[in-house]
Amino acid sequence: MKDVGLDDNLIFKYTHEFSGGQRQRIAIARSIILNPKFMILDEPTSALDRSIQIQVIDVLKRLQDKYELTYLFISHDLKVIRSMCDQIFVMSEGKLVEYGKADEVFENPQQEYTQKLLRAALKYSSN
């Protein structure tokens, strides 16, 4: 529990007493108990406030360093992807349309779909 920033005394609480961020950290703690080398994280920060998202991302980064974890990080949130990922795979309609190093894909997308996606995300984030 300490690895994910939670107190041990939380084990005495009921499920409905936890916030969304605490629930997410508990799910992460349950996953690392098995000492995995690879974890699939499907929208691990969705439905969380931005400040809680940042806390969860920090927990994931610390755990990745401490336990030498590899993540398959699935998300629609490009800010979170950019902060978490070394490599990016962009999919459209269930098909891979572009992949590469994160900086390269964000700074110089090759595919039209990726270019439109990044423009839309930039436009949305500036509003």
Predicted regions and their residues:
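A short, surface-exposed alpha-helical micro-motif characterized by mixed small hydrophobic
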Residues: 81-83
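Hydrophobic anchor residue at the start of the ABC signature
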Residues: 28, 56
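Conserved ABC ATPase "signature" region
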Residues: 1-9, 118-119
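A short, proline-enriched helix->beta-strand linker immediately N-terminal to the Walker B motif
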Residues: 33-37
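Short, glycine/charged-rich "phosphate-handling" switch motifs in NTP-dependent
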Residues: 87, 99
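Conserved ABC ATPase signature
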Residues: 14-18, 22
